[in-house]
Curated annotation (Swiss-Prot):
CDD domains: Tryptophan_synthase_alpha
Protein encoded by which gene: trpA
Complex and partners: Tetramer of two alpha and two beta chains.
Entry annotation: catalytic residues: E48 (proton acceptor), D59 (proton acceptor)
A Pfam family: Trp_syntA
UniProt protein name: Tryptophan synthase alpha chain
Pathway field: Amino-acid biosynthesis; L-tryptophan biosynthesis; L-tryptophan from chorismate: step 5/5
Taxonomic lineage from the root: Bacteria, Pseudomonadati, Thermodesulfobacteriota, Desulfobulbia, Desulfobulbales
Gene Ontology CC annotations of this record: cytosol
Keywords: Amino-acid biosynthesis, Aromatic amino acid biosynthesis, Lyase, Tryptophan biosynthesis
InterPro entries given in the database record: Aldolase_TIM (IPR013785), RibuloseP-bd_barrel (IPR011060), Trp_synthase_alpha_AS (IPR018204), Trp_synthase_suA (IPR002028)
Entry annotated with the keyword Acyltransferase: no
Length: 254
């Protein structure tokens, strides 16, 4: 079943879906394993697993630090594929890879898609690769039936959104704020108008992330988006209180 179909099926029984984010190898793969267990047990619908990169341009300080520390501890792309294979076999929810194009390019584009497919991954988020620059990438995404997730930003024009939607499957990731992940700024006054533009540009489900960290944030998206994305906040929790803090937090979000 495609990622879009899985999410639409899940949405039938819920006001809004939850997607969470982990950085692979941070603070360790053992901790990742425990965190994912907590997330799944407490109702997360989809998990994006970030393959660490030294210069994650879309990520704020929390996720940047996690990327750098994971790399410093020796995390390799092959380990990330092995871990993904283990998780997709154990847990019956969709898993995505998130990373940057340099990782995909160095690994070999077709090989990356082949191995991701074999590992049970349902989609890919590569925020620094616009469709105009990724002809082969998007062709492989179609060939191997992995959803290439496209990101909309508050600065995206309606025309640009429609153009981007032509390359997307799975869902659209709508950045709630300008800047990087984990930002504390309030939602723009024009946020509802922005989401209306997102909805008008595509028939795909909409996920909203960047700075979503509380039940109030999630509740505010009901009726406007299909999925809320929580990233930096769960990493902060693990840093402060360990993996076991993630379960109660996720359970409190809806």
């Amino acid at each position: 079943m495609t990622l879009e179909k899985i999410l639409r099926e899940k949405k039938k029984d819920k006001d809004i879906l939850l997607m969470t984010h982990i950085v692979l190898g941070y603070p360790s793969f053992a901790a990742n394993r425990e965190v994912i267990e907590q997330m799944v047990k407490n109702g997360v619908d989809c998990i994006e697993m970030q393959i660490p990169f030294s210069e994650p341009m879309a990520d704020g300080p929390v996720i940047l630090k996690a990327n750098q520390e994971s790399l410093a501890r020796g995390t390799r792309v092959a380990q990330c594929f092995d871990f993904a294979r283990e998780m997709t076999r154990k847990h019956q929810i969709p898993f995505l890879f998130m990373t940057y194009y340099n990782i995909v390019f160095k690994y070999g584009e077709e090989r990356f898609f082949q191995d991701a497919k074999e590992a049970g991954i349902k989609g890919l988020i590569v925020p620094d690769l616009p469709p105009e620059m990724g002809e082969d990438y998007f062709a492989y995404a179609e060939q191997y039936q992995l959803a290439p997730i496209i990101i909309y930003a508050p600065t995206s024009t309606p025309e640009r959104m429609k153009t981007l939607a032509g390359s997307a499957t799975g869902f659209i990731y709508c950045a709630a704020r300008r800047g990087v992940t984990g930002n504390n700024s309030a939602l723009d006054e024009n946020f509802d108008n922005y989401l209306s533009n997102c909805r008008a540009a595509t028939t795909l489900p909409l996920a909203v992330g960047f700075g979503i960290k509380s039940k109030a944030d999630v509740q505010a998206l009901i009726g406007k988006a299909d999925m809320a994305v929580i990233g930096s906040q769960t990493i902060r929790l693990v840093d402060e209180n360990g993996p076991k803090a993630v379960g109660p937090f996720v359970a409190s979000l809806r």
